[in-house]
Amino acid sequence: MSALVLDGKALAAKTEQELSQRVTALKARNGQTPILATILVGDDPASATYVKMKGNACTRIGMESIKVELPSSTTTEELLAKIQELNDNPNVHGILLQHPVPHQIDERLCFDAIAPEKDVDGVTCLGFGRMAMGEEAYGCATPKGIMRLLEAYNIEIAGKHAVVVGRSPILGKPMAMMLLNANATVTICHSRTRNLPDLIKQADIIVGAVGKPEFIKAEWIKDGAVVVDAGYHPGGVGDIELGPLVERAAAYTPVPGGVGPMTINTLIYQSVDSGEKKIR
């Protein structure tokens, strides 16, 4: 029997319809829409594309976006000043600082300068800590998108053994904490993990977040597992060797069309939520 496809593209499209209705209702009541401010430092083509995609997503649901573009020569102090300006603007409800920034900028310092209530991408240390403690906070967009996808397809998490391969601060670590908060038993693996195949074979839920094409082999994954691939590489492959799994996994995220669409969708979802809390 074929595995259940966790279709992030379809869920994102459905969610956009719901978000559009919420934005329309907000504008009808108050004459305002949520506003997301995106900050792009430098001229990296991939980053510019990602920022454009986020702006397009805002447009599709009828909310506004402000695009702040700064030169590659921008200093940490200049970027901090711009972030503070957006923090102080009551009409801005979400702030996104596009990663990566030029090498001379202290990216972590700038991330943490974003006001927690406007941290709709879930990048501040304060937001991460609050999320990890089970307090109200906006989650990192990709892992939060994965959790929303699992919930939408009624994937059971509580009591399951989840193995997360990857420990980045914006994916692997928050993913593990979100699964733990959902009552999974969580193992975090990384580049120095010994006996990685043996650990992965124990997983009821496997999340590939290692950033290497097809690094996780299909033969390492047991029958009936839920397979979540957060990677994307040239040729349309992810971090997991997916081919043989479509017939023996319980469920899987396709690449592309699984996790990717949920990342931007979650950013917009959290921006609308922030707007609803502030627009009276």
From Swiss-Prot:
Q: Which domain of life is it from?
A: Bacteria
InterPro entries reported for this sequence: Aminoacid_DH-like_N_sf (IPR046346), NAD(P)-bd_dom_sf (IPR036291), THF_DH/CycHdrlase (IPR000672), THF_DH/CycHdrlase_cat_dom (IPR020630), THF_DH/CycHdrlase_CS (IPR020867), THF_DH/CycHdrlase_NAD-bd_dom (IPR020631)
Tell me what reaction this enzyme catalyses.
(6R)-5,10-methylene-5,6,7,8-tetrahydrofolate + NADP(+) = (6R)-5,10-methenyltetrahydrofolate + NADPH; (6R)-5,10-methenyltetrahydrofolate + H2O = (6R)-10-formyltetrahydrofolate + H(+)
Coiled coil start-end: none
Q: Which UniProt keywords apply?
A: Amino-acid biosynthesis, Histidine biosynthesis, Hydrolase, Methionine biosynthesis, Multifunctional enzyme, NADP, One-carbon metabolism, Oxidoreductase, Purine biosynthesis
Q: One Pfam match, by short name?
A: THF_DHG_CYH
Task: Give the Enzyme Commission number.
Answer: 1.5.1.5, 3.5.4.9
Cite a single GO BP annotation.
tetrahydrofolate interconversion
SUPFAM superfamilies named among the record's database cross-references: Aminoacid dehydrogenase-like, N-terminal domain (SSF53223), NAD(P)-binding Rossmann-fold domains (SSF51735)
Q: Which GO terms describe its molecular function?
A: methenyltetrahydrofolate cyclohydrolase activity; methylenetetrahydrofolate dehydrogenase (NADP+) activity
Which residues of the sequence carry a binding annotation for NADP(+)?
G166, R167, S168, S191
CDD domains reported for this sequence:
NAD_bind_m-THF_DH_Cyclohyd
Pathway(s) it belongs to: One-carbon metabolism; tetrahydrofolate interconversion
Q: Kindly state one GO CC term assigned in the UniProt record.
A: cytosol
Family as reported in the entry's similarity comment? Belongs to the tetrahydrofolate dehydrogenase/cyclohydrolase family.
**HAMAP family annotated for this entry?**
THF_DHG_CYH (MF_01576)
Description of how the protein assembles with itself and partners: Homodimer.
- Free-text function comment from the UniProt entry: Catalyzes the oxidation of 5,10-methylenetetrahydrofolate to 5,10-methenyltetrahydrofolate and then the hydrolysis of 5,10-methenyltetrahydrofolate to 10-formyltetrahydrofolate.
Q: What is this protein called?
A: Bifunctional protein FolD
Native species: Cellvibrio japonicus (strain Ueda107) (Pseudomonas fluorescens subsp. cellulosa)
Lineage of producing organism:
Bacteria, Pseudomonadati, Pseudomonadota, Gammaproteobacteria, Cellvibrionales
